[in-house]
Amino acid sequence: MNEYITQIEKCVALHPYAMILREKDMDRQDYRELARHIQVMCRKASVKMFVHSDISAAKYADCGNVHFSMEHFKQMCEEQADVIKRLDCVSVSCHSMEEAVNAVRAGADQIVLGTIFETQCKPGKMGAGLSFLKEVCRAAHTVNPTVKVFAIGGIKPDNIKKVLEASADGGCMMSWFMQHN
């Protein structure tokens, strides 16, 4: 765990726009503690942190930013819309035009759209490409001009310029950040 924390410290020191803390296999209490620790680290560096899906962990970490899968976001909108509305920033993973537009209409402040390029995380799965990214950005901004759209999947320093040229607000680079520094 210490190597992991050290790598996150290195990532935060690079001052990315944000960090999404996703640890789906971690014990819930351990995740809450980790979220609190990382939130302190991120605040000091003025990096926005998102807790992944766990509202109670977000509260525990004093973090108002939560990232959801599309399925979980839909469920939260149906069952706990008041909780969603009280969050500072709601981020949603989307994999199609329909999901992106629906997420923005339902109140997402940002979407993470993928998979744009082929990635090591999902070998053999073709990326949707830059045209898809551009079309979704256009549609999302038609619904809400202030929504942020971030690309995910195979994003690296050598292709981020193309992502930005496709009208995205940025790109998520988990593998690159965790393997470099």
Task: Name each model-derived stretch.
Residues 66-79, 112-126, 154-181:
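Glycine-rich phosphate-binding active-site loops on the catalytic face of alpha/beta enzymes
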Residues 49-64, 95-107, 138-145, 149-151, ...:
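Catalytic cores of alpha/beta
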Residues 90-122:
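Histidine/lysine/aspartate-rich catalytic loop segments that bind and position anionic ligands
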Residues 32-53, 78-96, 126-151, 157:
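Alpha-helix-loop-beta-strand connector modules within alpha/beta enzyme cores
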Residues 1-65, 75-87, 181:
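N-terminal positively charged helical leader segments and presequences
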Residues 20-22, 50-52, 69, 91-93, ...:
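A cross-family glycoside hydrolase active-site/sugar-binding cleft signature
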